[in-house]
């Protein structure tokens, strides 16, 4: 979504924490990249200490910044992590916003990673939804460009007591194989359309490239870099 023209000339350090990789990029006030995307593998046993050590290594490679935007794979409220199913239990109740502000002396906003990615893609009209297909399953929904907080479709029961993430996350892809996974995804898309009445759906994440069925005109596969590019827009919305 286009940024407001009144936005001050502030550079945003965007961080995308994922189950397999930690990425950063520096954006200008218009949301355009000032650096290439930098990446390190998510550490084994990904505790806050280990993941933040990787973030620090990446941060050392970028120029000065004015503020920080973080996308995190779980439920986030006011900078505090409430769920981290694909990382480590130590993340639960960890105040990531406060920790980074203390370290870097810069203002920080933290939000669900799918929500941040969606900000880079949405048009700000009607009901729009994003599903991210990666290590887990991310989800976010927006009305007229505003995020509806709290959606965590991944762990909602779907088929025979198993969750959407059980089928559509990385483990589900490996278990069921590409053909079955695509059928499950098509079914999930139909379910979300009936439940949320979205007008536009965006599909992101590393496994979006594995989609092999024809998508309707109002369904769009988006770049994985949008997980970083949405960071500047996060500063124009409530986190």
PLM features: what roles do these ranges have?
Residues 2-50, 81-83, 146-174:
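Short glycine-rich, Thr/Ser-proximal phosphate-binding strand/loop in the N-terminal lobe
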Residues 12-16, 67-69, 128-132, 202:
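Short glycine-aspartate micro-motif
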Residues 21, 192-224:
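Glycine-rich phosphate-binding loops at beta-strand->alpha-helix junctions
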Residues 22-26, 74, 119, 137-143, ...:
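Short beta-strand scaffold segments in enzyme catalytic cores
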Residues 64-73, 199-206:
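Short glycine-rich phosphate-binding loop at a beta-alpha junction
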Residues 96-114, 147-184:
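Glycine-rich phosphate-binding loop plus the immediately following alpha-helix
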